[in-house]
Design a protein with these regions (language model features):
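Active-site-adjacent structural elements that line small-molecule/cofactor binding pockets in enzymes
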Residues: 1-201
Length: 201
């Protein structure tokens, strides 16, 4: 499935209902990934300006949580307003499915600590980047007096398992060239080779 959803460009009422339905269908196995996204597409296609993005993101996220936890929710916000909206069924997980943030900038990492339940490192970031981000997160968690043991971390990793190491590298380079327009990124952020070699790394 997708790594993160962008709450800034979604209707939060419809999104809350869709995610709650997924949690019901999966019998409580949903983890919600949210991200800030890049500004250019959001402004050009959805009319969300740079100065609105942060406020829309937080407001949308708060609406999700309100609809998941309250019998009837009322919101008087900057971007969305509604009165006594009931959403059923509620998620299986209580109070709601864990919300993990995808972020790499300090402001996004702080947002994750303030509003999230976990964090995932981007697949396009290197191991060195990941270590740096984890260090910042640990600091922000400490400043917020949050227990790091209750804030799980993860990293998406691109892997090509093939006993022919050269062929595995070619496949990754081709995929990164198509997806990111940067074939060399594959070498910086991926694992490839036999199963044993990948596990060893």
């Amino acid at each position: 499935g997708t790594s993160v959803i962008l709450p800034t460009i979604r209707n939060p009422v419809q999104l809350a209902k869709s995610l709650s339905s997924l949690d019901q269908l999966s019998q409580g196995r949903l983890t919600v990934g949210v991200g800030f996204g890049g500004p250019h597409m959001q402004e050009a296609v959805f009319g969300v300006t740079g100065e609105q993005r942060s406020r829309r993101f937080v407001e949308g996220l708060n609406i999700l949580k309100a609809l998941w936890t309250q019998p009837k929710a009322t919101v008087s916000g900057t971007f969305w307003n509604f009165t006594n909206i009931a959403m059923e069924p509620k998620p299986v997980q209580k109070p709601y499915p864990p919300v993990w943030f995808g972020a790499r900038e300090p402001a996004g990492l702080k947002r994750a600590v303030r509003h999230g339940d976990g964090w995932m490192g981007a697949g396009s970031s290197s191991s060195a980047d990941f270590v740096q981000h984890v260090g910042l997160l640990r600091r922000f968690l400490d400043e917020a007096k949050r227990d790091p043991a209750t804030f799980p971390l993860s990293k998406r990793v691109y892997i090509a398992i093939d006993n022919n190491k050269e062929r595995a590298e070619r496949r990754l380079r081709q995929w990164f060239g198509d997806r990111y327009k940067n074939a060399d990124m594959a070498v910086r952020v991926s694992l490839w080779g036999s199963l044993a070699e990948c596990l060893d790394k």
